[in-house]
Amino acid sequence: MAANPRKILVTCALPYANGSIHLGHMLEHVQADIWVRYQRLRGNEVHFICADDAHGTPIMLKAQQMGMEPEQMIEEVSKEHQADFAGFDISFDNYHSTHSDENRELASFVYTQLKDKGYITNRTISQLFDPEKEMFLPDRFVKGTCPKCKAEDQYGDNCDNCGETYSPTDLIDPKSAVSGATPIMKDSEHFFFDLPQFEDMLKAWTKSGALQTETSNKMQEWFESGLHQWDISRDAPYFGFEIPGETSKYFYVWLDAPIGYMGSFKNLCDKRDDLDFDEFWKKDSTTELYHFIGKDIVYFHSLFWPAMLEGAGFRKPNNVFVHGYVTVNGAKMSKSKGTFIKAGTYLEHLDPECLRYYYAAKLNSRIDDLDLNLEDFTQRVNSDVVNKIVNLASRNAGFITKRFDGKLSETFAEPELYAEFANAADRIAELYETREFSRAIREITALADKANQYIDEKAPWVVAKQEGKDQELQDICSVGINLFRVLITYLKPVMPLLTERTEAFLNETLTWEGVAQPLTNHEVTKFKALFTRIDPKHVEAMVEASKEDAAAAQVLIEAAKPTGPLIDEPIEAEIEFDDFAKVDMRIAKIISCEAVPKANKLLKFQLDIGGEMRQVFSGIKSAYTPEELVGKHTVMVANLKPRKMKFGMSEGMILAAGPGGKDLWILEPHEGAQPGMRVM
C-alpha cells in the first residue's frame, strides 16, 4: 500500500450513443484501463469513469430512422456499450449518460456561471435551413460539390477527395443530407462562449506540462491563427438540454458532453458515502484529474473545456493524454474488407486479453497511430504470452505437483537471478506511470527470455530422470515458477484475467511489493491451462463476420431510407394501350352521400354522369364526412361491371389517391369539366 496514496480521477472520452464500439474505441479504453489498474496496484485511490455522449442532431435523426424515441435508442446503445467494455475488462467505477439529471443540473450551472460573469454573448447568424424538415442543418448534414476540386457528394465542412475545408455555403449545388431538399439561408439568434477572453490563461496552461509536447505545439498554431467565440447553442428541433431562460434553444452537444465527466462522477458520489464531488472538482483541489482522448477531439479538450472550467470556477485537468488512430493491416479500417471490427464481434471469436496485450505492446506516450496487423497480432501473442510466459509455468508446475505435492522449495536456489527480476520493478513501474507500455512489455519479455534460458540450461525434464536429484529438481522448478510469478505481477495491469487464473494456481494474490521476495515452502494448486494460443482460423472468422456485420448494417440503412409512393408501391408491369383503352373514366357529380350503417369504411354515393344516375359504394369514410363531398365533381370508372355488395349494388368506382386511412384524396377535375365527359 502506498504510504501517501494519491487521489486520482480518470476519464475516457465519451462514446457517441448512435453506434457500436469498435476496436478503434477500444485502444483508448484499454490504454486508460492499464494505467488505472497500475495505479490501483500501487495502492493509489483511483476513480475511473465514463458515460455515453447522448445528445445532438445525429442521435435525433437516427432515432427517427429507427422509429423510436431518442431516449429509448440511447438506453439500448448504452447497454451494448457497457457489455462491450465489460467484455474487455475495462474496470470503470461508473458508466453514465450525458442525458441525465446530474448532467442537466451541472450544464445549467456552468452556463449560468459563465453568463453571470460576462462570458456569454448572443447575436443573429445566418445558417442553412432544410425547408422540408424545418430544421437548421449542421455542417455534416449538408452535401454538395466541392468548390475546389469539384468532387461530388462532399460534406459541408471539408472535402474527402482534396482535403479542402470550407463553409457549407461554399458548396456547389448543396443539398440537405436529411431530406435531399435544397437548403435556404435563415437567420437565428445564437449564444456564444467568449473564448478569446481566456487566451492568456490558455497560453500558460497549454505550456505548463498539462499536455503532451505535440499537443502543446499544435495549440500554439491555433493561438497564432486567433481564437474565436464558440457557438454553444442549437435551434429546435434538437435532442439535448434546453438553455435556461430561452425558448427552443438548446445547448450544443460539445458544451454538455465534457460536463458529462462531472455528471458521471456526481452520479458515483451520490451512490457512495465516502466520495466528495467538490474535493475532486473545486478550483483549489489537490486531487489529480486526467483525461484520455483521441487526437480528433484535442481542440475541445485543450481550449474550450479548460476555459469553461476556469470561467465556471472549477479546477482544470492535470493532464490530457492523447493517442492516435487505429489502422488495421496498415490501412484505415474498412467495412468491405472486414477490418472495421466491432468490439462485440471480436469478443465472439477471440480472447479480449490478446488485444489488451497487443495494444500494450505497441502503445507509448506519443500521439502515434497504432497498426493492428492481424498476422503480427497472432504471432506476437502466441510467441510472447504462450511460448515465453505461460509456458514457463507449464514446464515446471507438473513436476512440483506430481513429485513434491505442490510444495515449492524451502530455500530459493538462485537469489542473484531473482534479484535481477525483482530489481526491474522500479524501472517497469516508471514505464507504466509514463504510459510507455510498449517499453514495459519489452522489459517483461526480455526477462521471460532469461527465465526460459535458465530452464533450458537446467533441463528439469532430464534431472527428473536421474536418481537422487529430487532436491535439485524441486529447486529448479521452484525458481521457474517464482520467475513466472514476477512476470505475471508485472503484467497484472495488462492481463487481469490471466492474473486471476495465475493467482488461483499460485494460491496467492499478486502485489507489486510482493515481488521483492520469492515464494518458499509454499504450496501451489494443480496446474490448469492458463491461456489459449490464437488460432488463425478464429481471426479469419472474425474478419468474415465483420464483413457480414457491414452487410447487415447496410441492409438496415437501406431499410431506414426515406420512403415515398413509388418506393412503397412500385409501378405495376407495363400494359398495352388497347388494355388501357378498355377503361372508361367519366366525370361524375356527387348528388348525395351518406354513411352506410354497420360499415366502418363505406360511404354510399348517388352520382350524376350526364343524364344517368349511378349508385357507388366507396371505402373513403376515414378521410371524408358525407357533407364535405356533396356537390363536388370527381372521376369514376363507369364501365366497371356492377358488383353486388352486402349493402346494395355498386355500379362503378370513384378514383382516389393516397396510402389510406385519413390520407386519401378523391380526384377532382378543373373547373369546366361537366358530368359525363370522358377522361382521356
Swiss-Prot record:
The keyword Transport does not apply. Is required not only for elongation of protein synthesis but also for the initiation of all mRNA translation through initiator tRNA(fMet) aminoacylation. Gene3D superfamilies: HUPs (3.40.50.620), Isoleucyl-tRNA Synthetase, Domain 1 (1.10.730.10), Methionyl-tRNA synthetase, Zn-domain (2.20.28.20), Nucleic acid-binding proteins (2.40.50.140). Zn(2+) binds at C146, C149, C159, C162. A motif ('KMSKS' region) lies at residues 332-336. Residues 579-680 form the tRNA-binding domain. It comes from Photobacterium profundum (strain SS9). One of its GO terms (biological process) is methionyl-tRNA aminoacylation. Homodimer. It comes from the Bacteria. This is Methionine--tRNA ligase. It is found in: Cytoplasm. GO terms for cellular component: cytosol. PANTHER family: METHIONINE--TRNA LIGASE, METHIONINE--TRNA LIGASE, CYTOPLASMIC. GO terms for molecular function: ATP binding; metal ion binding; methionine-tRNA ligase activity; tRNA binding. A motif ('HIGH' region) lies at residues 15-25. Keywords: Aminoacyl-tRNA synthetase, ATP-binding, Cytoplasm, Ligase, Metal-binding, Nucleotide-binding, Protein biosynthesis, RNA-binding, tRNA-binding, Zinc. InterPro entries: aa-tRNA-synth_I_CS, Anticodon_Met, Met-tRNA-synth_bsu_C, Met-tRNA_ligase_1, Met-tRNA_synth, Methionyl/Leucyl_tRNA_Synth, MetRS_core, MetRS_Zn.
